[in-house]
Amino acid sequence: MTSVNEHSLLINNNENNDNNNNHINQRNNKNNINNRNNIGVNNNNNNNNNNNNNNINNNNNNNNNNNNNNNNNNNSNTGKIYLRKKKKWNFRKKILPMIVILIITAIVVCLVVFSLPFDSSNTIYNQSPFVIKEDDNLLELAMKSRQNLLNIHGNQTISKLDFAILVSNPIGYWQLATFNGKNNSNPQQTLFLPLLAAAVNWCMNQNNDPHCLQTAAGPMMNDMSSIHAGILMDIITDAPNQEFQTSNSTGFQSWLTKRESIELFLNSFNLLGNQTIINKFYPSNSGPTATWGEGLIQKLMGDNQMCPYDSALLMLNLVKSGILSEGQSYMTDLISRQTFSTFTSIGFGLPPGTTLHSVLGTSSSTKDLNEIAHLVLPNGGEMIFSIFSNGYENFGHAPYQSSILGNFAGDLIRSLGIDIGCPNKIVMTSQDKNCTVTGAPWTLDTSIQAYNNSFLYISGGVTPTSTVTWSFTINVTGLYEVCVWFPNGDLHTSVSYKVEPGDGMIYYFPVDQVHYGARWIRLDSFFIVAGNQPIISLSNRGIDPSKTVVADSVKLTRWPSSKGIPGFSNDFVIAESPE
């Protein structure tokens, strides 16, 4: 676990530079650059030495002239001896001022040194424009939320959850908590975030608008297209795949240097760390797998590698204009996401009306589930999550294959109290007095996956047909999001939730209760007038006798409202980005 430092800290330029230089200097083609730099340094040192020698010779000549003058004076004053009177040190005029100056200097030095943030290794951190402080309480609560998720879903669903979390503090800094924050993993499609930043940087260096590569960048981010990601990499590196046979082939080293331009760009802002960002994401525009030069790179450098900590810093710099400020609006537009969508995982734990910027990376074969996300809650609370996990669940029923991290995010937000001031929510369990059963009785059972550790169930085919009904009373008119919660179960089946908002309309929503339990499943959002009593119900009608129906909890959450517009949040209006 990452040690937490009581001192405030800024991002470690010195440590990052060492790590970044070690990473970049692994490339053989950098040796020539280093040699040229060394030659330049040696030339400068030689020039300085020559200048110093000249100065010494001049001083010696001056001393000789002074000695000659003194000898002449002595000769002209032959026979006369003058005794020089020894001066006394005056304490008030000489010694006391020197002591005062020394004391003032010592005080200034101490103030400067102790005002600098240090890490546990006494390394000074300094990266403008963000002040970041490791926070004990944030780490403790994040670890509890992490453990809760692992306990509920077990090792079969998820066993890895590395994270870096940043929370905006109202007094002007970011709180930080990390767990395995520097551990590298295959980023999958989260690679597209640094690739997008490099594309905007390329456009600006060409004196073009930041969105000059939108034709490729748009499909890459909107459709997660690896083909367009490959096209984009070829353009900004000016190094499309070539038919090199070995790393000693003519031209390979110069081609490799071009391919490293994305890493060099990140390194220039101290955002690379020990990450490897040089390979395409396959299948790509150059083939289904890495071949020729791209194959050689993959053998030499290994797979792409990213970590939660440096990924979180990249997202922070992009959305808060730490770098590429002219392209900030364009980039945030491209990565704006809806909660409960295929483009996010933590979004399944966020209240409606949340502003979400996110890049998601998944793999069916390795179960990788990675997300780099920035969010602003309806109350203005702001956070950055960078999570690398193995919680991808390939059971179909989009968008819930990637939904598991929503529990972690939602639990942590509630624990921190960051959601205080957001629109109200109502959670009703099967044990609430306003949850009623009509027909045959349901059986009460317990499970760690149940919302409040208890739930009701009934088999299909039981007569008479039985229904569980959750009845709500609405006191504030508005747009309400309706979600349901239930535990997993192999004997469960697909059911149909019935929603009656109170306006005379009836809606049915099929939900698979076999998979994707122990999380909030959104049915839809409904406009409900104050005084109405919306009803959500679940029945065993038409269910196979060998299967069971589970009734657990229902949640209604009101969307934010502004200027009389239901669902409108002030954060929906994008402020002018800084120049």
From Swiss-Prot:
Phenotype of the disrupted gene, per the record: Cells are 5-fold more resistant to the antitumor agent cisplatin than are wild-type cells.
Annotated signal peptide: none
Alphabetical keyword list: Endosome, Golgi apparatus, Membrane, Signal-anchor, Transmembrane, Transmembrane helix, Vacuole
Principal location listed in the UniProt entry: membrane
Gene assigned in the entry: gol
Further remark: The protein is normally retrieved from exocytic vesicles before exocytosis occurs. GFP-tagging of golvesin at its C-terminus traps it within the Golgi apparatus, making this a useful marker for this compartment.
Membrane topology classification: Single-pass type III membrane protein
Transmembrane segments: 95-115
Organism, scientific name: Dictyostelium discoideum
Cytoplasmic side: 116-578
Subcellular location: Contractile vacuole membrane; Endosome membrane; Golgi apparatus membrane
GO cellular component, one term: endoplasmic reticulum membrane
Region (Required for targeting to the plasma membrane): 1-75
Membrane-side (Lumenal) residue stretches: 1-94
PANTHER family for this protein: EPHRIN_REC_LIKE DOMAIN-CONTAINING PROTEIN, TRANSMEMBRANE PROTEIN
One Pfam family cited in the UniProt record for this chain: Golvesin_C
Record region (Required for membrane targeting): 95-118
Region (Required for transfer to endosomes and contractile vacuoles): 559-579
Biased composition (Low complexity): 11-77
Protein name, as recorded: Golvesin
Ranges for region Disordered: 1-79
